[in-house]
Structure formats: structure tokens, C-alpha cells
Amino acid sequence: MWKKRNFFIGILGVFMLAKGWAQSERFSVMTYNIRLDIASDGVNRWDNRKTPLLHQINTIHPDVLGVQEALPHQMTELHKGMPGYQKVGVGREENYTGEASGLFIKTSRFIIKDSGTFWLSRTPEKISRGWDAACNRVCSFVRLEDRRNGKQCWVFNTHWDHVGEQARTESLALILTQIAVRNPTNEPVILMGDFNTTPEHPRLKVLENDWVNTFAALNPGSTLGTFNGFHTDTPNNYIDYIWISRQAFTIHSSEIRTEKPNHQWLSDHYPVLSVVEIKP
């Protein structure tokens, strides 16, 4: 009797250890257009939003966070308010002022092996504006090594122009070229950010063979969007994405976070949060 009991306890222990190891391989990724700090937002200004927004981020505690529209002081305030993260990314304007598409990496989970920023233009290595864009636009990236298993991956975070149709199309082509050049060994890649493009647009068709939209994959038929504009709790304008290399990852969960504590908008976008795992 005791031998049987000990045998089943042993099997249960092995199962629990295996389950715990599998879970430890997973990591969370979040993309968040935090809305720039601008006086015309009135009650929704950054000063009113930053404390609850930081509380939201620190509660979720993502392993990788990509933000858009972050001005230099917002990047600094986020970094100060998020212990245990390293920040990557610079502003898009002269002297690296202006909005950043920044990344925050949890240092207890990942080692940053490479990082940088390029401009979405014909001269990506220079501060510049591309095609018919209304603004300078950037993409910041990191190459990460997982401290738990040594696996490596890339993360690219971007914010496409809100006006220029050609700029949005060319931005995607440029980013895919940059990924190919920087990642010749085809390591797993995450591409995320505010694309200012809805899912049905033809420009995104180029991603369908090699990439997976994490939210769409696990929430087929969902009509919930990400751009709330500070005025609708259930938007249908989906423009914020987390894409992953199709063959490289398992997706465990993906959701749009719609918290609105005490009726306070945290941003004019909802963040997208996905939990993924690099395949063996």
C-alpha cells in the first residue's frame, strides 16, 4: 500500500516539476501606445494618467514592454517607476528628442545582447522622415538572451505614420529588410507596435505566411479594438499588434487589457498582452 502511494506521489511530483518547467519557459510581451504628454488632453494629460498607468504595468509585470509615443521625460518616468527594467530607444527628432518607440526589458529574465533604433525612411541610419509621412518615425529593437534557458530572440517595436499610406507600406518593407539583415541566422522574432493599420488592410497580407498575429490567433472573430480615443470603452479600431515568427513560438494567451481604474483613462489606446514560448 505504501509503495503504491509513494509511487503515485513520485509520479505527481515529476508531473508538477515538468509543468513548472514548461511554465518557466513562457514570457510575457506587451505593446502599449501610452499617448504623448500634451496639454490639450486636459483631464487625460500624462500627469493624471502616469500613476495608474504605472500601477497597471507593474501589476502585469511584463517581461518585455514596447511603448509608443513616449517623450523623453515619459521614458524617464516609466523607467524610474518600473524597478528591474532596462530601457532601450531614443526620440525620433534632432538630438533624440521627440517620441520614442521604446522598449523596457526585465533584467531578471533577459540579457540584452544587441539594441538600437533606425528611422522609417530611405536613410534609416539617419534622423529622417520617410515618403509621405507627416512625422519622423522609428523602430527600436533588441536581441535578447533568456537567462533561464539561453534561447535568443529579437524584438522590434515601432509606430507607423498616421497620415502617409505609402509611408506605412514602405515602413513594413523596410522593417522586414532590417530584420533579415540583422538576423541572418533566422532567430525567433517579435514585431510589435502601433501600425495605424487595421487587420483587413492588404499591406498586412505580406505577413501572413511567415508571421502570426497573436491576438487574432487566439481570439478569432473578436471585434474588440485597441484605439479607444479616450471616449469608448469597447472600440472596434484594432491597430496595435504583437506579431511573432510563425514557426518559432507557441502562443499561450493574448488579450487586450481594458482596465479603467476609477473611470480614469490610462491612454487613448488599450495595450495588447501576449504570453509566448520559444519552441525547442
Predicted regions, residues:
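Acidic/histidine-rich helix-loop elements
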Residues: 31-51, 96, 120-134, 161-164, ...
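Active-site beta-strand/loop signature of hydrolases that rely on acidic residues for catalysis
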Residues: 26-34, 53-78, 104, 142, ...
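Short, solvent-exposed loop/turn elements at domain surfaces
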Residues: 36-43, 67, 113, 165, ...
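N-terminal, active-site-proximal structural segment of metallo-dependent hydrolase catalytic domains
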Residues: 2-8, 20-81, 92-98, 279-280
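Metal-dependent phosphoester-hydrolase catalytic domains
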Residues: 166, 170, 180-189, 197-280
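Solvent-exposed, acidic/flexible segments
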Residues: 43-50, 67-72, 97, 135, ...
